[in-house]
Amino acid sequence: MGIIARQTIKGTIATYIGVAIGFVTTFFILTKYLTAEEVGLTRVLVDAATLFSSLALMGTGSSTLRFYPHFKDDSRNQQGLYFWTLIIPFVGFLIFLICFFAFKGLIVRAFQDNSPLFVNYVYYALPIAFFVLYMSVFEANATILERVAVPRMIREVFIRTGLLVGYLLYGLWHVIDLDGLVMVLCATYGLGALLNLCYLLFSQKISFKPDFSKITPELRRDFLWYTLFLITAALVGSVMPTLSSFFISAKMGLMFTGIYAIANYIATMVEIPFRSLNAIVQPRIAVALRTSPPDISAATRLYQQVSTNQLLAGMVILILIWINIDLFFDLLPNGEQYAAGKWVVLILAISKLATTAFGVGGSSLSYTRWYYTSLFFTLILVVLSICLNNYLIPICGIEGGAWATLASLVIYYILLLSFVWWRVGTHPFSWVQLKVLAIGLLMLGLNYLIVLAVGKLVHEPSMLFRICEAIARTLIVSVVGLLIVYYGKVSPHVNELIRKGLRMVK
């Protein structure tokens, strides 16, 4: 087995372990031992730090990979490349610090009325941002060395475990106060960055010794233009996922941010299939679009297959979440409070479904000569999201933040996919997707009939009965949906997976 395969397997295992830790932490520790306001505080601090670090990074991660062939040689310092990966983000962080203190008054005024707790702890976002920044830098360096498993383990397992310990020390064992919890957050990310650095140094394959011999005027110009593009892309790309959290914190308070954060975590499950499949399919789309002439037919066929499969997988996950959402909140610690985010779950899950079904389109644009236009569409997305969040949250509350996200994405994908169809000639739509949506409606209809029948037979069910009924109902709805997909020949890939599964059972 090659090094890439081994590293991929180890990284995947680390990711799934991290998901399990994150699930337990979010749904059984945070909701039980922290108030919604405290959950909101930890969420906004990390969101702010992530945003700050993305800007300070100045595109170093992508630039390192792009310009690595120019520096590559047999030396440990790759002719000064690793040195620049330390210096450029540090300069970016200094620039960010100047901007932060210049606009500190605006930040305080925006949050002081409804989220004074965030104002009290906003300075802690700075060290967290610094540590997250260099975690990203060291991970990029490890990627060059083709050693991604340990950095992935540090990010997915160590960081999540450290945060879990902090939450338990604060909420369950009462060893530390809120100040101590925030310091544990800082220390956890700091140790994560330090462990990444130690791993690189102990590998004895890297050196941060400076070397200016490869910095030509042409390289400097190319690097500056590419970095400018990446900074702008990072700005819009990092702002978008955190906009609603910031607006809700500023206009409603951290308690509502905590409720929104839990709802968003539930909705994020719809995206899980997209994350893995998107990384696999991108090289194949790139090959189709980079041939001379581009194989538009192959790219379109692949695009439609991926969109259909993603729509099917995401829709099934969304339905299974939604038909059990009331029971989930009843089982969740302090679920009566977090149930206020029920409709946020549905709205955000639909927006995640749109991303899973059509997100490949934006990525495929990167492999054409119109790659730079993706930045323009992303800017439109962010501006729409800012305007809609500002307008809808005061009217609709946390649901307004979810509606703002969904509406922004719908408009964004209409514009983006229209442009891709016009310029590239590919599109994700096929009649099979109408079958997928019809199957989803049938599954929801079947669930409704079962709930109606059970409700007539049992008027005041116990919690144990509700759990058993939910398990049985979920199995029935899933099996019926799977049979319709199989015999309706909706997706050859899904049918092949089903046949493989049946052969394994036999």
Question: Could you describe each region identified by the protein language model?
Answer:
Residues L449-K506:
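Membrane-proximal transmembrane or re-entrant/amphipathic helices at the cytosolic face
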Residues M1-I4, H174-V184, N196-P241, R284-R301, ...:
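Interhelical loop/hinge segments that connect adjacent transmembrane helices in multipass membrane
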Residues M1-V24, L45, R76, L200, ...:
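N-terminal membrane topogenesis motif
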Residues I154-L169, W173-Q204, L379-L384, N390, ...:
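Hydrophobic alpha-helical transmembrane segments
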Residues F27, L57-D73, I144, A263, ...:
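Helix-loop junctions and terminal segments of transmembrane helices
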Residues A5, F131-R155, A349-I380, Y391, ...:
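Membrane-interface junctions at transmembrane-helix termini in multi-pass inner-membrane proteins
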